[in-house]
Amino acid sequence: MRRRALVHDRITTGVSPRRVWDLCANRVVPYWVADVNPWAMLAISHPWVSEEDRRDVMTPINGYEWPVPMPKDANLDLIHIEILNAEEEHYAWLDALCLRQEHGKNEHLRVDEWKLDVPMIGWVYGTHQPAVCYFNGLGRPLHLTLRDFESDRCWFRRAWTLQEIIRDAIIGGQTEDDAMEQEVRRKFDEQLTRLRRMRERPRVLEFASEMQNRMSTKPLDKVAGLVHLLRTEPIPIYDAEQSEADAWDVLTHVIHYKFRAELFFFYPQPGDGRKCWRPSWEQVM
């Protein structure tokens, strides 16, 4: 089915996640084994901490297929318990466990899998299912300060998490002594409210403006993080060798016609790239 979905480097039909986390068995299984409705699966959102603050964990949960990048002060077993207690769902999707990571024993499979799997990440967070958000890093307690909102590793400043905004997300990592200071709580609530409104009234230039202030490990990921938000059809593959300018060219050809019209009518200058009817990637960034 996945091979049939790919036509000329485009994903032409809806594709479910390749793998899901079976919470009862505590094992990663193929999606077809679970055969679960998308809205009955718990999505897990988190910002990746810096390399010096994380470690690679080999675990039987994913059959030791690849090392799972984790914050040094987090524990997969504790995350499993928290997720089990968060909702009644039996399956979850966590990128570090369900998306093949680097340096695994079948590394040669990762590039091909990512072409299809990375563009479909937004689908996991866009089908109205419940989600758990760890705002301070995967499995870490919710200890936020005002300085954290300016950190390049903050959930509110990562490129990938822009597509992971859920209206009624469950806040992960809460403990009894995690009461936020009043000013921090106000900032936290304001940021969430602003992002949720942005999702309710989508505008391509507003998404682009938001992405300007966000960080990504690879420049290309900023473009890839817009694919789901801009209702692309068909969906471009994730090509790690592609430049962000080329990826933007491809994206603007397949985004929803309303977003193309917005670029044409409302961007104040002609494009300085390959097309004059819409701005180049450098212009929007």
What are these regions (language model features)?
Residues M1-A92, C98-D117, W123, T127, ...:
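Metal-dependent phosphate/diphosphate-handling catalytic cores characterized by acidic Asp/Glu clusters
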Residues W32-V36, G122-G126, S151-C154, Q163-I166, ...:
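A general structural signal for short secondary-structure junctions and capping/turn motifs
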Residues L42-S45, V132-C133, R158-E164, A224-L230:
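Conserved, well-structured core segments
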Residues P47-W48, A86, I165-A169, V227-E233:
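Generic structural signal for hydrophobic core residues of well-folded globular domains
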Residues R55, V124-K187, F207-A208:
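Glycogenin-like
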Residues P67, P71, N106-L109, E113, ...:
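Conserved aromatic-histidine-acidic binding/catalytic patches
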Residues L116, M120, R157, K218-D221:
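Short, well-structured alpha-helical interface segments that form or flank functional binding sites
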Residues T193-M285:
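Short helix/strand-capping turn motifs
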